[in-house]
């Protein structure tokens, strides 16, 4: 949509578009790389490893930085090198051997042309949110199916559950079929919505970050589930419970599908995070009641 004199609504749209135009112009100066067949795999690997790296550093520092214990989901667990390297190796192997040929085939058939204009900010944000909700729905159905059908679980999903305690690099420790399914849903949604390339980049970055955060093993005050109100978002402790109990919390991000199907289970509050100030292992809701009772006693 070009910017021209018109209604106030059109002017507002142009203003929000102009907010993103400098960023989009910068990306377009590197169009030769962004349109190359190696870009999707390179972008995915760098983004994923880049998001995992801070948590790997925290795990290395954890024994010598006591304050980190307050935010660790499993205070007595820290991944070893023997756990980290196979996870990283499997991610690199699958992206290079399986994902790259698929993206190469797509590039040969339909090389993308980058538009000159950036998307409107409201459009970008709304499309990213819709893509996240669609992805959450699709993975919930896929995930539930692969837990309810024993053959599917043993053949395709069991690999991801080999690490019962979460850590960042275990996020993509999965079978090729599971990685292919996630990639398919990831690409399908942006294609159906005909998203702008900048929206696609943004969605992929956010999606990778949320998945890494869910497996990071750390629950910080700025974690996503603390920023989203009304318990709509599960978060790291929520997903960690799925890894420990298997029969609950199947949605990757949001909680509405698990609520509707009765598979939602409140995440236990780690001892070091308890708001009541004691070494409590109650759920978040019960801990809130515990805290109120403690205030009344004082």
Swiss-Prot record:
Question: What's the top EC group for this one?
Answer: oxidoreductase
Its topology with respect to the membrane? Multi-pass membrane protein
How would you describe the post-translational modification of this protein? N-glycosylated.
Q: What is its main location?
A: endoplasmic reticulum
Q: Name one Pfam family in it.
A: FA_hydroxylase
Q: Where in the cell is it found?
A: Endoplasmic reticulum membrane
Task: Spell out the family assignment given in the record's similarity comment.
Answer: Belongs to the sterol desaturase family.
Q: What is this protein called?
A: Cholesterol 25-hydroxylase
Q: Which gene encodes it?
A: Ch25h
């Amino acid at each position: 949509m070009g910017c021209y004199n018109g209604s106030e609504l059109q002017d507002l749209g142009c203003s929000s578009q102009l907010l993103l135009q400098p960023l989009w112009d910068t990306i377009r100066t590197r169009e030769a790389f962004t349109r190359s067949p190696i870009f999707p795999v390179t972008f995915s690997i760098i983004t994923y490893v880049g998001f995992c790296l801070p948590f790997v550093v925290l795990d290395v520092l954890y024994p010598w930085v006591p304050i980190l214990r307050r935010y660790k989901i499993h205070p007595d667990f820290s991944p070893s090198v023997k756990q980290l390297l196979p996870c990283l190796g499997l991610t690199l192997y699958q992206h290079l051997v399986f994902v790259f040929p698929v993206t190469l085939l797509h590039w040969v058939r339909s090389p993308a042309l980058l538009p000159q204009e950036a998307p409107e900010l409201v459009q970008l944000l709304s499309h990213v949110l819709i893509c996240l909700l669609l992805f959450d729905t699709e993975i919930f159905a896929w995930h539930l199916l692969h837990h309810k059908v024993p053959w599917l679980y043993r053949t395709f999903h069991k690999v991801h559950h080999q690490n019962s305690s979460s850590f960042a690099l275990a996020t993509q420790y999965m079978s090729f079929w599971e990685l292919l399914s996630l990639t398919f849903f990831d690409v399908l949604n942006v294609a159906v919505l005909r998203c702008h390339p900048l929206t696609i980049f943004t969605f992929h970055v956010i999606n990778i970050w949320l998945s890494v955060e869910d497996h990071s093993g750390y629950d910080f005050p700025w974690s996503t589930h603390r920023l989203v109100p009304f318990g709509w978002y599960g978060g790291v402790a929520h997903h960690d419970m799925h890894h420990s109990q298997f029969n609950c919390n199947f949605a990757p991000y949001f909680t509405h599908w698990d609520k509707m199907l009765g598979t939602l289970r409140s995440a236990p509050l780690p001892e070091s995070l308890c708001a009541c100030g004691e070494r409590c292992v109650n759920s978040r809701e019960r801990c809130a009641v515990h805290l109120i009772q403690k205030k009344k006693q004082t």
